[in-house]
């Protein structure tokens, strides 16, 4: 199966080239390179430094080397997926996700001992879109937690723990801070996060700054009153700044 979005430009010869690879019959997923056009119209070819068939033990290593720099393993449209594999693990899309829904779907296959064939063939060209502010960061947090479990717990790559500690801490802070943007109460979201003891044990404010650092610190300390004070202080300071900015603008116009 080949999933392609309506605004993508698939290359018709990709199917023929990928399926004629000698090891294509041994793979559950075939992956190719792709062209990415950024917001300025510049086109970059995204590829991997190695090709060939990789097993389920090697897959998380390749995933960590490429995913968080290029997004290579998180896109559907440069991949051919064996239908039988999808059905065997009952992989489904989470329709409630507003960001990274492709990655959420693919991780289900990656965790199911999938054999992946990396090929040099270019599958398609796509245009990058601006990030959506209304994205549910808590959904992203749960997805990153699932990936961390796959890489660290299931595949025993404990060397990746510092990376996920930083990543999960950031998504945790974003989940609380940006909750009002999607109509959620930040304190209710904070309570939900604090109930996850395994997640809270991984949190670290070391590489966070400002209000995000304060949020994670309060969550680790299970201190909701302090969290409420920090959020209220930030909102008050932001409101005061906007008022001063408005007054300065009016003063300039009246001068």
Predicted features, each with a name:
Residues 45-46, 69-78, 121, 139, ...:
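Noncatalytic linker/hinge segments flanking ATPase motor cores
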Residues 114, 121-129, 134-166, 171-199:
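Catalytic core of nucleotide-sugar-dependent glycosyltransferases
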Residues 74-82, 143-149, 164-174, 200-215, ...:
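Short secondary-structure transition/capping segments
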Residues 182-255:
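Membrane-interface aromatic/basic loop that binds lipid-linked glycans or pyrophosphate carriers
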Residues 6-119, 124-139:
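Donor-binding/catalytic cores of nucleotide-activated saccharide
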Residues 37-41, 63-72, 152-161, 177-181, ...:
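Low-complexity, flexible helical/coil segments
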């Amino acid at each position: 199966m080949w999933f392609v979005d309506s605004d993508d430009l698939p290359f018709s010869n990709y199917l023929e080239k990928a399926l004629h690879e000698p090891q294509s019959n041994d793979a559950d997923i075939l992956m190719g390179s792709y062209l990415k056009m950024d917001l300025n119209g510049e086109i970059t070819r995204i590829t991997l430094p190695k090709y060939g068939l990789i097993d389920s033990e090697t897959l998380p290593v390749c995933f960590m080397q490429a995913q968080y720099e290029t997004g290579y393993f998180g896109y559907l449209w440069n991949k051919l997926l064996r239908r039988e594999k999808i059905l065997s693990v009952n992989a489904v899309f989470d329709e409630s996700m507003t960001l990274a829904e492709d990655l959420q779907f693919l991780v289900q296959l990656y965790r199911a001992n999938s054999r992946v064939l990396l090929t040099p063939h270019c599958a398609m060209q796509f245009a990058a879109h601006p990030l959506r502010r209304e994205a549910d960061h808590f959904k992203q947090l749960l997805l990153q937690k699932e990936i961390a479990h796959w890489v660290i717990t299931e595949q025993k790559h404990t060397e990746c723990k510092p990376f996920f500690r930083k990543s999960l801490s950031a998504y945790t802070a974003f989940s609380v801070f940006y909750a009002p943007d999607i109509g959620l109460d930040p304190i209710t979201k904070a309570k939900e996060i604090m109930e996850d003891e395994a997640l809270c044990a991984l949190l670290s404010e070391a590489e966070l700054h400002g209000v995000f650092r304060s949020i994670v610190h309060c969550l680790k300390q299970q201190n909701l009153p302090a969290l409420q004070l920090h959020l209220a202080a930030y909102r008050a300071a932001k409101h005061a700044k906007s008022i001063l900015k408005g007054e300065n603008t009016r003063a300039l116009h009246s001068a």
